[in-house]
C-alpha cells in the first residue's frame, strides 16, 4: 500500500493542538525541534493553555519547560534529562515515576492520554513506510493511540528496522526538516572508570547477552571485551562503544536464544557513526520498549549480564539511581527491568557499578541513603556490586554479610567509619542505622553522606 504524502509547514501542523491536550515528543536525538518551536510560538501568542508535554530523555532545547510558559505548558516527563533537570528540581516541571518498560502502557491503557504525537521519521520508501529511527521506546505507543500524529521527515533519520517501521498512512501531517540529528560524544574513561570496567568485564562470560547504557562506565566495560567471544546485545540503548566489538566479531549474537544474530534496542544516542550503523541494517532491531524491557523477554536469553550505575548505595544494598536526596536527577528508567530480567536468566548476572567516591571526595557508599533518596533497585534485587576497588557477590548474603562485602569495596578512607556504623547497628540493623545517622550527621563534612544532601551535585 502506498500513500500520497503532502507536506505542510510546522506552523500549520501544530494548529491541531488544543488547550488541555496531552502531547508526546519522540526521544533522544529524535526530538522534533521545528514542531516544538512552532508549538511554543503558539504558546507565546496566547493561543494555548494547560497543554501537557510528555517525553523520555530528549536532547536539544526544551523551550516548553521555560517558566515563562507557566499555565501554558506543563511538562510531565517520564525521565528527567539534563535539559529539564533544573526546572524539575525547582518544582516548575513534574515527573511521572515509571519503569521504562511500562511507559508504553501508560498510553495504551489510557492512564496518560495522547492527543498529539510529535515525532521525527526517515524519508518514506517506495512502499510508503517511514522509520522511527532512533526512538521507538514509548513513541510507537504514542503513534498508535494519538488523535493526531505530526511527523518531521528528515533525511538524516536512519532507516531502522524491527518495530521502527510505520506506514505513512498512520501520519496526519508531514513537515520537511533536514536538520542533522543531535550527537553525543564521550570522553575516554579515566583511571577509576577503567578499573570498574575491568572488574565488570571479568564477570562477563563468553556467549553473554549484554545490557548497558551509554557513558563512561559502559564504554570502560566495552573497551575490556576485545578478547571475549559470541557476545549478544539486548538492551534499551547503545552507543559508539559497541561498534568496534561488532566490527571485530566479538558481538555477533550467535549465542542468543531469541533474536539470534540481532542487536536489540529501543532507542539510541551517539555519534553520526552510530546512526550510520543502524541505517538500513537488518542486524539491528529497534523495538517497542514493552518488548526490550520486559523481564520475561530479557530472561529468555542465557547469561544476560546487565550493568547499571547508581548515585548512592547503602550498606544493606539499597540502590538510589534517580535522585540526589529529595531532588530528582534522572528517573527510574530501565534499571530494575534489566536487573530482574538478568536475575531470571540462566547464568545471568545483574551488576550495579559505580565509583566509590563522588567528584568532591565524598563516599557514595553510606550507612543509609540520604533522606528523600529514591530506592530504584531494592536490597532484594541486587546481586553483584562493583566499584574501582573490586566486585562483590551479594546474592544470598545476610544483611551483615553484605554490609561487610559492600564496605570492602568502598574507598579505603571511608571504610573505618562505615564499619563503625555497621558494628553499632549490628544488634538491630535498620533501626540501628537510623540511630547512627542521627548521631553522626556531622560526619558529612568529613566524607560520608549521612544526614542530608547539602547540594544537588554532592552525589555526582
How would you label these PLM feature ranges?
Residues 1-415:
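Conserved alpha/beta enzyme-core scaffold
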